[in-house]
Amino acid sequence: MSEVTTIARPYAKAAFDFAVEQKAVDSWLSMLLFAAEVSKDDTVQQVIHSSMAPEQLAQLFNQICGEQLNEQGQNLIRVMAENGRLSVLPAVVAEFSALKAELDKELEAQITSAAALSEAEKVKIQKSLEARYQRTVRLNCQLDPSLMAGLVIKIGDDIIDASVRSKLNRLAEALQS
């Protein structure tokens, strides 16, 4: 786990718990996404990493965000600025999104295939994964011709490698031993 994730997690958890309590998870996600995009701006990055007083930084950041942040969202920005943590806002969004997915019983599957998958293949893979994990699964597909054929599925810490490349690698290892 990266240091940024370790720093971001408590902020995301606090915001998420509050959002669940207020029944406002989607609006909080929107606020955090907007604030994270603002924090990625080059000019804003320079200000975040400058020697500006935390109170001034929070006030400036909240002014830039304007009405996109409610009072509680502005309070989160203020606390993060006071602790010198505004630079981890994108990681806070990632952690918040993961908590939301857990609440919604959703998983994201990273599918890497040697060739483009047809819609029928995607549906079949999605249904199989949903049956296995008992959750709604969103597919994120990408191509990697180096797999030769087959695919690799990553969900959280689980990896299902059904690629020709890995089978050839295992065969080569078996022949060498």
UniProtKB/Swiss-Prot annotation:
GO terms for molecular function: proton-transporting ATP synthase activity, rotational mechanism. Pfam families: OSCP. InterPro entries: ATP_synth_OSCP/delta_N_sf (IPR026015), ATPase_OSCP/d_CS (IPR020781), ATPase_OSCP/dsu (IPR000711). Disulfide bonds: none annotated. Keywords: ATP synthesis, Cell inner membrane, Cell membrane, CF(1), Hydrogen ion transport, Ion transport, Membrane, Transport. It is a peripheral membrane protein. It is found in: Cell inner membrane. GO terms for cellular component: plasma membrane; proton-transporting ATP synthase complex. The keyword Magnesium does not apply. SUPFAM superfamilies: N-terminal domain of the delta subunit of the F1F0-ATP synthase (SSF47928). Its main location: membrane. Coiled coil: none annotated. Belongs to the ATPase delta chain family. F-type ATPases have 2 components, F(1) - the catalytic core - and F(0) - the membrane proton channel. F(1) has five subunits: alpha(3), beta(3), gamma(1), delta(1), epsilon(1). F(0) has three main subunits: a(1), b(2) and c(10-14). The alpha and beta chains form an alternating ring which encloses part of the gamma chain. F(1) is attached to F(0) by a central stalk formed by the gamma and epsilon chains, while a peripheral stalk is formed by the delta and b chains. NCBIfam families: ATP_synt_delta, PRK05758.2-2, PRK05758.2-5. F(1)F(0) ATP synthase produces ATP from ADP in the presence of a proton or sodium gradient. F-type ATPases consist of two structural domains, F(1) containing the extramembraneous catalytic core and F(0) containing the membrane proton channel, linked together by a central stalk and a peripheral stalk. During catalysis, ATP synthesis in the catalytic domain of F(1) is coupled via a rotary mechanism of the central stalk subunits to proton translocation. This is ATP synthase subunit delta.
